Each structure stands twice: as structure tokens, then as C-alpha cells.
Amino acid sequence: MKPTREHITGLMLAGGRGMRMGGVDKGLQTLHGEPLAAHVLKRLAPQCGALLISANRHPDTYAALGAPFGATIVADTLPGFPGPLAGLLAGLRTARTAYLLSAPCDTPGLPADLAARLARAMDTIDANQADIATVTTIDAQGEVSLHPVFALLRTTLADDLAAFLDAGERKVRAWYARHKTVEVTFTDERAFYNINSLQELSDLERA
């Protein structure tokens, strides 16, 4: 059965160290007068029945940003900012729905139909009831890029992910490879543009 909105909990990943931005909290940097995280929440919330924010710093600030959407703050249970899989694990453990939709806090243009398209792909015969659906894009030159932190995942994967992390593994694609994963191609690569530096943020502000 194709998952619908009420079966999906959204997870905005805002738990990183922002090293390429000089260590600032990336989701709290402003674009057009609002934090990047606020832009993402506005696009993510309508696609989900419940909402979580993975934040390892400034939880009170993120709680205030998430309050209009009824969002709950979750934090990594592993020390040392081990990467997006730790945020995913916190989300999988906390969600009370069958599916979790993840997106990073630095992608203010994420598609309004992200959940619907990933859910449709998980339910296809070819996907054979996939465990994970994730995103690829194709640029004007025909080059394909994978965007693994945009994903729809079954929350039953939590124990397997915990074991993977306990073994010292950290790579998102390596964990996906353990499961039935389907890739969904989006033609608008700009929707998945993520901001990695203050210069990129400034450029987007002027665009």
C-alpha cells in the first residue's frame, strides 16, 4: 500500500556542525529574512502527518521555529556529531508512523511533491515494496547526482541502522545498500540545491 500523508513523519536534519560554514548552525542562517530551517519546514510540513527536527545545538531556537508546525526536537544519541545517519536513527526511533521522510535544513527549495513521488516509487511493482526511496537528479549535461539525505524510509529499519552505527559505519549509501532501495529521478536539480557556504547563501539571497 502506498504511504499517504498520515503514514509519514517528516524529519528535518539540522544536527550537523556546519564545518563548511565556519562552524555556524547552518539551519539558523537567514535567507530573505527567515532562517533556512523555516523555509524547509514550510515545505516539509504539508507533506507529513507529524514533524521532527534533528538538532544537536540550539534546541530552544529550533523548538520555536517548529512550534507552528507542532514539531518535536530530537537529538543524536551518539556522541561527536557522527553524521546524518545518527539524525536518521533518532528520527526512526521517535516516529510513531510507518514511514519517515528526511530532508536537510539547508535546501529551501525542496519540492512540494517530494513525499508523494517517493511514496509512489516505493509502492511500484518494480520496487517490490522498497524499504527506502531516495532522490537522484539529472543536470543539463545529463550528469546524474544522488541526494541520499532526501529519503523516505520504513521506520522498521531503526534496529538495523543502530547496529550499523554501533559497528562504526557512517556512510549513508553503504547503509542503503543493505536494503531494497529505489531511486527517484527529479528533473529540477535546483530544488535540491543545498547551501554549503556563507558565500553560496549570499549568492542565493541576491538571485
Name each model-derived stretch.
Residues K2-E169, A174-Y193, L198-D203:
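Nucleotide and nucleotide-moiety/phosphate-recognizing core
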